[in-house]
Amino acid sequence: MKSEILCVGTEILLGDIVNTNSQFISKELANLGIEVYHQSVVGDNPQRLLDELKLGFERSDIIITTGGLGPTQDDLTKETGAKFFNRELVLDKKSLKELKEHFNRMGKSYSDGNNIKQAYFPKGSTIFPNPYGTAPGCAIEDKGKILIVLPGPPRETKPMFKNYVIPLLKKYSNGIIKSKTLRIYGLGESAMAERVSPFIENSTNPTVAPYAKEEDIILRITARAAEEKEALSLIEPVEIELRKILGVNVYGEDDVKMEEVLGRLLIDKGYTLSCAESCTGGLIASKLINYPGISKAFKEGVVAYSNEAKIKRLGVKKDTLDKYGAVSPEVAKEMAIGIAETSNTDIGISTTGIAGPDGGTPEKPIGLVYLGLYNRGEIKVKELRHAGTRDMIRKRATMNALDWIRRQIL
């Protein structure tokens, strides 16, 4: 069956909130083998919403909406759906009871006012309870068309979809679509695509497609099959070949992040780590402590931004700073050695650079970053040249640092 997603809310069109519901729903539908052909956003306008429903059902069998279920006057998704299917709105007493109980749990007094509209549904609807909010969802099935109406807040949308929508749609599922994602760092998108171009160009089931993210590149392998086991058997040989081609540049898979991969490596191999950051301003430490249990390996992080702090906290020599400047390989070395010695760790990583938007010179332009790496007595320095905003430069330097440590201890 063909499906599409229609998100309702002027706040999305204005860019006030990020629409994460479409991404979540698309992934879940793929797992059911239901293809998504269109995604749309419409403001809080009943006529435009009605127009979108008319257009959508001309080309799709299933439309899933999010948003527009609240108590205010501009929350009109159910009303518009009822109009489209020519059904009256009827009060569901169970939903009204649950609505009143929700208010009671929150310590608020209930009054019908606009609130009661959340307990009205198009006649004949399948109702989805909402224990995380006040607005239940519903589904309307009519002449082979299905309208699924969900609340807008993701904390309400996701559990409702998993608990009620998936069981409803499983009977319409024709197999599944399963994806496996390889996460890649250290290769540009074009260089990576060139290496794996035969898979991208010639594969049909599974298909292989690259996507550039802010911090890394992902390579998605997608298979269609009758069941998950069959899909995974199609994905596995392709994954093996891709890993052979890309080697150490593949650092993880699916939703695993670089800091999680590095954290596991450090703990499994018995390494301890400390970091001395200047231009990255604590981003390395912040990333590392995202991984639960990292205290077994990560001992200390110091943000030494000024020259005085580099001298006092890390033991960087004043003569080194005077001769080479703070942004130099020499200072990066002394920072890495200093933090490893003062923290008594196997590894010390340091960053010093010019993140901009000011401070660059022809000799030391904006985006120049030096990483220092002390690893059990061995010291190395890496020079990076990044483009972009201050934030982008700092994030890229952080990812480079984490990846460099990973490669050194593999």
From Swiss-Prot:
InterPro entries with a match to the protein in the record: CinA, CinA-like_C, CinA_C, CinA_KH, Competence-induced_CinA, MoaB/Mog-like_dom_sf, MoaB/Mog_dom
Gene that this polypeptide is encoded by: cinA
Protein name, entry field: Putative competence-damage inducible protein
Family, similarity comment: Belongs to the CinA family.
HAMAP family found in the cross-reference section: CinA_B
Family annotation (PANTHER family): NICOTINAMIDE-NUCLEOTIDE AMIDOHYDROLASE PNCC, NMN AMIDOHYDROLASE-LIKE PROTEIN YFAY
Signal peptide segment: none
Coiled-coil portions: none
Any one Pfam family match given in the protein's UniProt record, by short name: CinA
